Amino acid sequence: MIYVCVPAHNESRTIGVLLWKVRKVLGEFDRPYRVVVHEDGSTDDTAEVLARYSRSLPLTVLRSDEQLGYAASVDRLLRYVVNDAPYPKRDCAVVLQGDFTEDPQDLVGLVKVLEGGADIVAGCATDSSGPVPRSVRLIGRLSRLALGKVLDDSPVSDPLNGFRAYRVIVLKKAFRDRPESEPLVSSEGWAANLELLGALAPHARRIGEAPLDRRYEFRARPSRLRAWRTLRALARLRGESWWSELDVGAA
């Protein structure tokens, strides 16, 4: 089972077309799947759009009355998968943004690498990706200064990118004996993606990568990325030693 996990806050303009594309891609891929969306206290029509699509694809919607934020949304989604997945050694969860900047077509590449033996598969943007906003380029350059060896020693080339596939057994081990009051991740945004990889990588035997396209031009709302807030969050992770004793193979 492929669980496509989508954190969504005020994504009514893109969540419908995203779900339609996921259904098309995974229907052709011919693997069982379920889309799990955390509707994070949206104030637009996101909930109404999700209700319409619940009749046309396997969809589970988790809801919070107030906005919890990206990290808490991802935590809830992954906990749901751990509790629902019938075959944790075979099933996987893929985290996909609700703003359509990540192409659902790339789900196939991630899952194929995982089926080849990897326990975590990280998306790696290709040179063919669309134009990158100036703020994203700036943070990408400055993040190396903010993170130092945490970035240099990472087991994947882009640990700030959250488009990844995780074998459920890895999630299960990470969440073991960890109540909901103790989330895996406390940062937000790009820092949350890095922190999540740091929490899960020690439980993986093999970590791989798959190419993907980033399509910032498809976002139908203003970017929520704030350069200095993101850099401050990344700088707080500079002293982490996630990779110091990591012993995983490449996939």
Q: Where are the predicted features?
A:
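Short beta-strand/loop segment that forms part of the nucleotide-sugar
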Residues: 31-41, 62-64
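Acceptor/aglycone-binding surface of glycosyltransferases and processive sugar-polymer synthases
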Residues: 60-81, 90-92, 103-183, 217-225
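Donor nucleotide-sugar binding loop of glycosyltransferases
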Residues: 11-15, 42, 103
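Short helix-capping segments at alpha-helix termini
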Residues: 26-31, 54-58, 86
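Short, well-formed alpha-helical segments that are part of the catalytic scaffolds
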Residues: 11-26
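Hydrophobic helical membrane-anchoring modules
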Residues: 1-2, 20, 28, 53, ...
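A conserved acidic beta->alpha catalytic loop
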Residues: 39-48, 100
